[in-house]
Curated annotation (Swiss-Prot):
Function: Catalyzes the formation of S-adenosylmethionine (AdoMet) from methionine and ATP. The overall synthetic reaction is composed of two sequential steps, AdoMet formation and the subsequent tripolyphosphate hydrolysis which occurs prior to release of AdoMet from the enzyme.
The organism's place on the tree of life at top rank: Bacteria
Identification of the protein by name: S-adenosylmethionine synthase
Species: Bordetella petrii (strain ATCC BAA-461 / DSM 12804 / CCUG 43448)
The keyword Magnesium belongs to this UniProt entry's keyword annotation: yes
Length: 387
């Protein structure tokens, strides 16, 4: 983002959004497999519609997993336990149609070598990581607060304080930037699925007072801030009944809310041999440590790969003029301190663990979950000393 005055908007969605239901099922299946077989190859795709879940993709594993039960358990945990909500975990149909990974891909990824770190990338592609000093977790403010809003909606729904809330919700936050810094919230949009008997005036008041205002620190919400709550006037039909959900349809919500480019590859349902996921996590790890080291206020990292080749084709750093040393010098430090080969990333971030279901809602980045190794800033001191 350029250093001037502008408005910038990001959105998030709740765990009950149909695309996020699909993401969470895909990652729950990945975790169930990894619990038994951490060397499995998994590309688990999910479609969910009214009363129907379809599981497809490619899985090569020695694990014995009840995929149908994993899907039902995930839907129940999200809160879809009544047909009136759009899908019911007890009665929905679950169809399973998994194949094995293509041997043509496997020969490049699993190629035996004296140096096992030379495992090839599972596909070609480009990935981005980003960090900035706008929030405590070094994330852009609009997406960070958009996540907070739908997390609070879920919290108030689950603990019964607002019992008329239902699982599906979306948020959108527009910040006003002055000299490249977020100074106030211009507009908040929050749409939440609700019980049919609750009035729109009651929804409007509760959402503003109990969800929106507590999600922001003092000073960001001003008398000028505009609130748009359920702008269509009614949101009873939601979840997979309102829209068909698909894995990988919320890649900007999953990352930085549009604050930096996206390579196009989704995360959920993919084991870490897929650089779409693992290299994007590594790029975030790199960018966050660069900012934490004080080498820049903003840092964007691009990496790219060729299928079957271990070394990244490029590692490019862009600090948008905020770096205290040249971007090329930061990129050189990155190459010296981070192993961005696919297997190097897996080892560096300890990715062969059943940790992925947590990532599938409320963002893969900017969260202080102990399993999220890519959020650590343990390399910051090394980078600072080397600079």
């Amino acid at each position: 983002m350029a250093n001037n005055d502008f408005l910038f908007t990001s959105e998030s969605v709740s765990e009950g959004h149909p695309d996020k239901v699909a993401d969470q099922i895909s990652d729950a299946i990945l975790d169930a497999i990894f619990t038994q077989d951490p060397n499995a190859r998994v590309a688990a795709e999910t479609l969910c519609n009214t009363g129907l879940v379809v599981l497809a993709g490619e899985i090569t594993t020695t694990a014995n997993v009840d995929y149908i039960q994993v899907a039902r358990d995930t839907i129940r945990r999200i809160g879809y336990d009544n047909t009136d909500y759009g899908i019911d975990y007890k009665g929905c149909a679950v169809l399973v149609a998994y194949d094995k990974q293509s041997p043509d891909i496997a020969q490049g990824v699993d190629r035996k070598s004296e140096d096992y770190l030379n495992q090839g990338a599972g596909d070609q592609g480009l990935m981005f990581g980003y960090a900035c000093d706008e929030t405590p977790d070094l994330m852009p403010a609009p997406i960070w607060y958009a996540h907070r809003l739908v997390q609070r909606q879920s919290e108030l729904r689950k603990d019964g304080r607002l019992p008329w809330l239902r699982p599906d919700a979306k948020s959108q936050v527009t910040f006003r930037y002055v000299d490249g810094r977020p100074v106030e919230v211009d507009t908040v949009v929050l749409s939440t699925q609700h019980a049919p008997e609750i009035s729109q005036s009651a929804i409007h008041e509760a959402v503003i007072e109990d969800i929106i205002k507590p999600s922001f620190p003092e000073g960001l919400i001003t008398p000028r801030t505009k609130f748009l709550v359920n702008p269509t006037g009614r949101f009873v039909i939601g979840g997979p009944q309102g829209d068909c959900g698909l894995t990988g349809r919320k890649i900007i919500v999953d990352t930085y809310g549009g604050a930096c480019p996206h390579g196009g590859g989704a995360f959920s349902g993919k084991d870490p041999s897929k650089v779409d996921r693992s290299a994007a996590y590594a790029a975030r790890y790199v960018a966050k440590n660069v900012v934490a080291a004080g080498l820049a206020r903003q840092c964007q990292v691009q990496v790219s790969y060729a299928i079957g080749v271990a070394e990244p084709i490029n590692i490019t750093v862009y600090t948008e003029g905020t770096g205290v040393i040249p971007d090329e010098q930061i990129a050189k430090l990155v190459r010296e301190h981070f192993d961005l080969r696919p297997k190097g990333i897996v080892n560096m971030l300890d990715l062969l663990r059943p940790i992925y279901a947590k990532t599938a809602a409320y963002g893969h980045f900017g969260r202080a979950e102990p399993e999220f190794s890519w959020e650590a800033t343990d390399k910051a001191l090394e980078l600072k000393k080397s600079a």
